[in-house]
């Protein structure tokens, strides 16, 4: 193999992500697919549901932490995905869409959780010697409190049609915020300045 050919192989390899990162690529696609699925339930929002709209206090203070979590962003992805799936698996619900559509949403979330878990496990294998940071623990706890407020709202409203309409909109909003944070982190991590700081 000539030196020139070796140089080309090295250059191509530099821009091809490792195989394990494919789980994370698929995860980004799944999040966007679920944003669309959840958005499809927003058509025809009943006026009678407006009185039940609640501020679930999404913890915006965690966003600066997330935007700097190069090594832990996938653990946060798994946390959000699994908590969202737990909400949509609650029993005794009155879904705001047809049962078939509801199953599509749950199936989409299950796929997102599975991919988030695989992505997270890939990351853990690579960083076994690095314990989770205090920032990660803060994000982990705040997300737990946020989804608990959503669950409590559903319970108090007896899983009503309006409650589910509102919760679906909220979780979609959460996914959009998080998806933007992932994209921003990716842009930052791929910048020459960031790479230089890691050296």
Curated annotation (Swiss-Prot):
Highest rank taxon of the organism: Eukaryota
Expression induction or repression: Upon exposure to double-stranded RNA and interferon-gamma.
Keyword Disulfide bond in record: yes
Signal sequence coordinates: 1-21
Recorded GO MF terms: cytokine activity; cytokine receptor binding
Entries under PROSITE patterns matching the protein: INTERFERON_A_B_D (PS00252)
Keywords on record: Antiviral defense, Cytokine, Disulfide bond, Secreted, Signal
Miscellaneous remark of the record: Transgenic mice overexpressing IFNK in the pancreas, develop insulin-dependent (type I) diabete.
The protein's name: Interferon kappa
Lineage, top ranks: Eukaryota, Metazoa, Chordata, Craniata, Vertebrata
């Amino acid at each position: 193999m000539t030196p020139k050919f070796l140089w080309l192989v090295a250059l191509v390899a530099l821009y091809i992500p490792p195989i394990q990162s494919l789980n994370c690529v698929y995860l980004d696609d799944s999040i966007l697919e679920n944003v669309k699925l959840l958005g499809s339930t927003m058509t025809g929002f009943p006026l009678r549901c407006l009185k039940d709209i609640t501020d679930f206090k999404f913890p915006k203070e965690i966003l600066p932490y997330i935007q700097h979590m190069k090594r832990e962003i996938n653990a946060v992805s798994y946390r959000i995905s699994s908590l969202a799936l737990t909400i949509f698996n609650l029993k005794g619900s009155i879904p705001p869409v047809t049962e078939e559509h509801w199953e599509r949403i749950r199936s989409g979330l299950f796929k997102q959780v599975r991919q988030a878990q695989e992505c997270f496990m890939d990351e853990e294998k690579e960083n076994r010697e690095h314990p989770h940071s205090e920032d990660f623990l803060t994000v982990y706890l705040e997300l737990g409190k946020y989804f608990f407020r959503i669950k409590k709202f559903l319970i108090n409203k007896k899983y009503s049609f309006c409650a589910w309409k509102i919760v679906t909109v909220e979780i979609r909003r959460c996914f959009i915020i998080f998806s933007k944070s992932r994209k921003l982190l990716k842009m930052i991590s791929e910048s020459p300045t960031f790479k230089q700081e890691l050296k």
